[in-house]
Design a protein with these regions (language model features):
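Class I SAM-dependent methyltransferase SAM/SAH-binding core
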Residues: 52-91
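A short glycine-rich, Lys/Arg-flanked "PGG" loop and its adjoining helix->strand segment in the class I
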Residues: 117-129
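Residues lining the SAM
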Residues: 104-105
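Conserved class I S-adenosyl-L-methionine
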Residues: 1-51
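C-terminal lobe and adjacent flexible extensions of AdoMet/dcAdoMet transferase-like proteins
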Residues: 201-228
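SAM-dependent methyltransferase
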Residues: 134-197
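A short acidic, Gly/Pro-enriched loop at the edge of an enzyme's catalytic core
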Residues: 93-101
């Protein structure tokens, strides 16, 4: 387990505290629709941090060609119908390019700045000329007004219990997922980013914001920035 990361509950737990069975139960929600609307029809998509395929499978059903990348073999075992690659995202170099590179699950908020830089470099390295990078970022109130909870229509409760500063601009976040038959918890490190800080991080990797895709600013379409 990585320092500052922990997970509890039934089944396998990944190094960043994610429970494989939990993620196999979580619905995809509106996220595949957001990605599909921002992507060319039938696009080749590189999904970084695919997990069990929560978004992979709906995107495949919409006619996209998805390559799913995750560092967890246990997660990738659940992916069906897509090419899978087991690798830490920040170390990935496939030697090919994609119409769309997707970095979801708030991964851009990694508590480790060097990891974040590696994630964004991987995005920039794999996006085709004329392509785009779709990034999911935290909402403005993600670390405030806690605890808060949401009851999903499918019958489980997700609760953000706390977000405590641990130094250097990083917070330790604790989340709980309560189902009728099981409970999972996850503790992880996250670095809140203002819009300005987020856009600066993209610029450092040679990317720039094309537009924000959702009213709350949590989904972003970025594109390679031409040099010179």
């Amino acid at each position: 387990m990585r320092e500052g990361y922990q997970g509890t509950g039934p089944g396998a737990i990944t190094p960043d505290g994610c429970a494989v069975e939990l993620y196999s139960r979580l619905p995809a929600g509106a996220e595949p629709d957001i990605v599909a609307a921002a992507s060319p029809e039938g696009a080749r998509i590189l999904e970084l941090g695919s997990g069990v395929g929560r978004m992979t499978h709906p995107l495949l059903e919409r006619g996209f060609d998805v390559t799913a990348v995750d560092e967890s073999a246990e997660m990738l075992e659940h992916v069906r119908g897509a090419r899978t690659v087991r690798s830490p995202i920040e170390e990935l170099d496939l030697g090919e390019s994609f119409d769309v590179v997707m970095l979801a699950s708030f991964l851009v908020h990694s508590g480790d700045i060097e990891v974040r830089r590696g994630l964004l470099r991987t995005c920039a390295r794999h996006v085709a000329r004329g392509g785009c990078v779709l990034i999911q970022r935290e909402g403005e109130d993600y670390h405030t007004n806690l605890p808060r909870e949401r009851v999903d229509p499918s019958g489980f409760t997700v609760r953000i219990v706390s977000s405590q500063p641990v130094g250097d601009g990083v917070n330790s976040v604790r989340a709980e997922y309560e189902f009728p038959d099981a409970v999972w918890t996850q503790t992880f490190r996250a670095r809140p980013l203002t819009v300005e800080q987020f856009e600066e991080a993209l610029e450092e990797a040679g990317l720039g914001v094309d537009r924000y895709l959702t009213d709350d600013g949590t989904w972003v379409r970025a594109v390679p920035v031409k040099e010179g």
